[in-house]
């Protein structure tokens, strides 16, 4: 799943990461000089951000070592044939300056580095999805959540992220691991939910995705919980495409019990809050919450 996220952030991320990894693993030259130290800082920033753009600002960051030095490192580990193409992406401030464009004047689809669209404009994408939507549908699917939009023979089309499609080999491995998890599921509902998630990955059917999420949100009694899929859409300038993520957690029973006590006494905290009594609410209700420990991310 990690490589899916890297590729979704920018189509150049994986080729650049592979070159950087080659240099870190194989370079036999001077590693103590200032230029190599600056290269190392760039590598760490790259790994932390899952690509060439800052994790929060989404602006591209740059190595502080000279371009010529970076090229010499690539040549030293046998990656010199990629230097011209990749170094232009790495060093040019004009190529993919933002992961998700916030331009108020340009086409934010064309200007964004994210790998959700290729060869299409915002107007074309909006028109494509508007033609699909039924205003009378009270339970619409999340149109375009798990696809890349491209143009083929002059026509706008979707390429699904599913087994047999884009990211197929990686998703096949994810399905295999999910099937192992289903075999040891804590509850029948959890097992059913995992089965629907696997079906969704294999078909790309967004109605199945909705069905999985309904089961997932209703499964509240287990100790183990997870997030897995193309879920959050804030990396897309149009707020439509979702980035893949995977996370497993375990309920902390002791901490959750303390949280329940706090929630049950919400009115006491409100009545004794250090604010002017005029601003205290006469009736408050605690929330339903649990405390978890992350296992994998």
For the regions a protein language model found, what residue spans apply to each?
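Short, charged, amphipathic alpha-helical segments
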Residues: 191-196
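Non-catalytic architectural context of zinc metalloproteases
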Residues: 134-154, 158-171, 204-254
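N-terminal helix-rich structural modules
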Residues: 1-183
